């Protein structure tokens, strides 16, 4: 449309369902979104009710930059009928990268959907789980079954 808004389609093997299911909306200009929400500084961002949504939007824009550099990579999200969601899925060949965006440094493992969703796809695809987290650590951290990356410090190379 104008380049300010992106629509992220849901992941589904059936192309028709990708087109008919509701997409997620993201904004290209993170600064404009913060301005419209009245966020004037980092403290305002850290304490904002939409901090998680803002982080997900920021992560989305980092992934869009990465995806444009990798022909054939397709970016989606996943949500089932019970509301279980994976923020982003990158399809690259026979591999699905499951990406969760979390704004906090300390994450309750129960809030991650990797264990619920990845088994649904393991027979058909190779799978990898990545937590895109607002960490102060600039390096990739390996955790139980997934990697943690702050996309502001390190490129998300898939």
Language-model regions, residue ranges each:
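A short, acidic, amphipathic alpha-helical segment used as a generic capping/interface helix at domain edges
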Residues: 83-84, 110-118
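Accessory nucleic acid-recognition modules appended to NTPase machines
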Residues: 1-96
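Conserved beta-strand segments of alpha/beta enzyme cores
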Residues: 74, 128, 145-147
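Switch/connector loops and helix/strand junctions flanking conserved nucleotide-binding motifs
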Residues: 35, 108-109, 138-142
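Short, hydrophobic beta-strand segments that form beta-sheet elements in well-ordered domains
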Residues: 127-133
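Short beta-strand-loop-alpha-helix junction that forms the active-site gateway
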Residues: 101-109
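Domain-level recognition of nuclease-like catalytic cores that cleave nucleotide substrates
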Residues: 135-158
